[in-house]
Amino acid sequence: MAKAKFERTKPHCNIGTIGHVDHGKTSLTAAITKVLAESGGATFRAYDSIDAAPEERARGITIATAHVEYETANRHYAHVDCPGHADYVKNMITGAAQMDGAILVVSAADGPMPQTREHILLARQVGVPALVVFLNKMDMADPDLVELVEMEVRDLLSKYEFPGDDIPIIKGSALCALEDSNAELGREAILKLMEAVDSYIPQPERPKDKPFLMPVEDVFSISGRGTVVTGRVERGIIKVGDEVEIVGLKATVKTTVTGVEMFRKLLDQGEAGDNIGALLRGTKREDVERGQVLAAPGSITPHTNFSGSVYILNKEEGGRHTPFFTNYRPQFYFRTTDVTGVVTLPEGVEMVMPGDNVTVSVELIAPIAMDEGLRFAIREGGRTVGSGVVASITK
């Protein structure tokens, strides 16, 4: 069966749900599809279908990142339902990196929890430009306490340099929307939320004119067709027939893109912001891996040595409890993967304490496609302990 062609009529925006486990992120995602389905802007996706990977069911928590698409009168959205559990922060980092904006879900009955804070911090680190808040479970909350919860959320957002006073906070109940009970807390609140998302989350400026680059998230081999790599196009445009380089981790290789698809529909081209699959000519599944990038030939080079300006989380933010010294060996999380690196502190700096800002030199054990301004997280065994940006490339 031929694939339906994806028509691009409305501006496209990538958003997602973030927040503490069990505050209702997946229920809200389902509720949005249900309410927008009434106007033909979505196909209803039940909670179970969004929470679908087998290991998730067993634990009742969302591990994988689910992709849902829907549209409002103004925009087409690709929505990722991010993992909510602390154990899965690694997945959140890859999920949150795919967002032009996010809906922070906070249970009005419980208020901000440790992962609420962690996700706001992560959103700040991975550069999510704008957040909108949905105070969920209003059907179960004590009305007198809701105002306090709202103030608490605004303070927390301001603390992590989001404009806490200006961010829209919509109160409602995903459950009411799903069960068609209380319309004010259910359907109407969801419509209000989507209005806020439409107007408050800025239309992302797509760096379409820059040279093509797509971080590799996943690699599949499709029998009879070849190797498909998937990811979100970071910048530029990719057309069928374009030459690309596979850069990072190993020697750079040239190949040709023989097909581009999005949401399982064929495209003439993929552009910045699109989540696509690219079919590569003559490339074996084992030639490409997560952590590499596809890029316009000559536009980006792999490097192991750079100086980075970093912020090390303090203990209260879930960071280290002790200082580190020269020769510290954490993992550096670039785009989609962790690479171990050795840190050298600047002259005259004996040690770095949790909560410090410092410029460090790093030598990675494998080369990563990088240019100045590339952001990264510093992690130890899956826990984020710092964040930084490449200040200059030294080798």
Swiss-Prot record:
Region (G5): 173-175
GO molecular function list: GTP binding; GTPase activity; guanosine tetraphosphate binding; translation elongation factor activity
Leading EC class: hydrolase
Annotated segments matching region G2: 60-64
Pfam families cross-referenced by the UniProt entry: GTP_EFTU (PF00009), GTP_EFTU_D2 (PF03144), GTP_EFTU_D3 (PF03143)
Catalyzed reactions per annotation: GTP + H2O = GDP + phosphate + H(+)
Region described as G1: spans on this chain: 19-26
SUPFAM superfamilies xref list: EF-Tu/eEF-1alpha/eIF2-gamma C-terminal domain (SSF50465), P-loop containing nucleoside triphosphate hydrolases (SSF52540), Translation proteins (SSF50447)
Region annotated G3, chain positions: 81-84
Disulfide topology: none
Major location (coarse): cytoplasm
E.C. code: 3.6.5.3
Location in or out of the cell: Cytoplasm
Residues involved in Mg(2+) binding: 26
Keywords: Cytoplasm, Elongation factor, GTP-binding, Hydrolase, Magnesium, Metal-binding, Nucleotide-binding, Protein biosynthesis
Membrane spanning stretches: none
Residue ranges of every copy of the tr-type G domain listed in the record: 10-205
Region of interest called G4, as start-end residue ranges on this chain: 136-139
Described purpose of this protein according to its UniProt entry: GTP hydrolase that promotes the GTP-dependent binding of aminoacyl-tRNA to the A-site of ribosomes during protein biosynthesis.
Family: Belongs to the TRAFAC class translation factor GTPase superfamily. Classic translation factor GTPase family. EF-Tu/EF-1A subfamily.
NCBIfam families: EF-Tu (TIGR00485), PRK00049.1 (NF000766), PRK12735.1 (NF009372), PRK12736.1 (NF009373), small_GTP (TIGR00231)
Subunit-structure text: Monomer.
Protein name, per record: Elongation factor Tu
Species assigned in the record: Acidiphilium cryptum (strain JF-5)
